[in-house]
Amino acid sequence: MEKNNSAKRGQQDGNQQSAQPEKVGWVRKFCGKGIFREIWKNRYVVLKGDQLYISEKEVKDEKNVQEAFDLSDYEKCEELRKSKSRSKKNHSKFTLAHSRQPGNMAPNLIFLAVSPEEKESWINALNSAITRAKNRILDEVTVEEDSYLAHPTRDRAKIQHSRRPPTRGHLMAVASTSTSDGMLTLDLIQEEDASPEEHSTCEESFRVDLDKSVAQLAAGRRRSDSENVKLSEKGRSGTLPRHEVTSWDKPTQRKDSLDKGTVYTPQVPKKLSHSEKNKCASMEEILSRRDSAHRAVLRRGLEAHCTAAEPEQLSRLQELVALKLEKTQELLTEVKGYGEGKRKVKDCATSTTTSSSSSSSRSDCERILQESERLLGEASSTWSQARRVLQEVRELRDLYRQIELQQVDCNPKQSSQYRKSMM
């Protein structure tokens, strides 16, 4: 223990000697009272670390000083002023008061500075030195060699670890909660080489669906017209194919033709996978925030498309309805004619008695019955299709009227809003 303390003390003394003094200068020191006045003597004062050196002459070596005081024995340095004194010395005096501890024999020191500013400078320097001296005493802890703490990682080589770059999932999570309207998320999706179909707007998809429905409607009408014309020509010529299978005999083909004639309905969207949902998350947020703008754009597109295609479609549908009605009437007349022929054939069959004539008449009757049934089925299906076309025409007219009413209602609202904004 004594060896450790002596080693620390020697090291501190060496540090104090090598360090530069904090403050030096000439100050008058109080040396006692005479018969008529106080005795003040000029002294050279050096403040170095926690030691205060006082000498009669200016010296550079601390060994030649006359007095040395340890500031750890003192409590504070403060201004000393008498209340009734009017002398100039009263504004420049300061004292160094010792701490009131048992066994402390350090004297109180009184100094007189050259000016009040110099006095303040000395007070601040001495107080800071006293604080450091007290902290030095508290920080001194002697530890035996046997109780030293071991540091197994002190001599280990230190490696600088660079920061790991953020993962893509973290960037997506930050972008989804950011206030930039999903722009960062859109940039990340574009980096993944997404298809251009995923970035199409609602307005373009609606226009594509509407164009598809109109094209399919027109194609279905033309296809049904061509088939009906061919059938009517074959019926008039009297050549009825026996094993020919038309589109009216197959229920699946009939349903397809009817579906092609009706208005196109969009399919149910398929379920998206987890990765696709992550891709479309930001787009859903943007669309939810801009529902009003998209609705206005969709309404304008619907109105423009209906106004452009409505007159032509109505005229075509009316022509198709007229053709269907004419063909149904022709088919009904043919069915009636075949019914009369059937009766005549039955009368002839009863009058004939030979086996050869009876077999041929039976085959002819069966063929006529089949043809009449087929013609009757075609007539009924054509009639139902014509009724559906009429219903579609009525629905289109109602839709067009509703659009016109909405336009009429929106115009006064827009004009009133414009007037309010002008006011």
Curated annotation (Swiss-Prot):
Determine if rRNA-binding is one of this entry's keywords: no
Q: Please describe the post-translational modifications of this protein.
A: C-terminal fragments could be released during apoptosis via caspase-3-dependent cleavage.
Q: Which residues cross the membrane?
A: none
Q: Which InterPro entries match?
A: PH-like_dom_sf, PH_domain, PKHO1/2
User: Its domain of life?
Assistant: Eukaryota
Q: Name one GO cellular component term.
A: cytoplasm
* Keyword list, A-Z: Cytoplasm, Membrane, Nucleus
* Composition-biased stretches (Basic and acidic residues): 222-259
Q: Which Pfam families match?
A: PH (PF00169)
- The record's region (Disordered) falls at 1-21, 81-100, 217-277
Answer whether the UniProt record assigns the keyword Protein transport to this protein.
no
Q: List each copy of the PH domain by range.
A: 20-131
Q: Where is the composition biased (Basic residues)?
A: 83-92
Polar residues biased stretches: 7-20
GO biological process terms on file: regulation of myoblast fusion
Cellular localization per UniProt? Membrane; Nucleus; Cytoplasm
Job of this protein: Plays a role in the regulation of the actin cytoskeleton through its interactions with actin capping protein (CP).
What is the protein's given name?
A: Pleckstrin homology domain-containing family O member 1
Q: Which organism is it from?
A: Gallus gallus (Chicken)
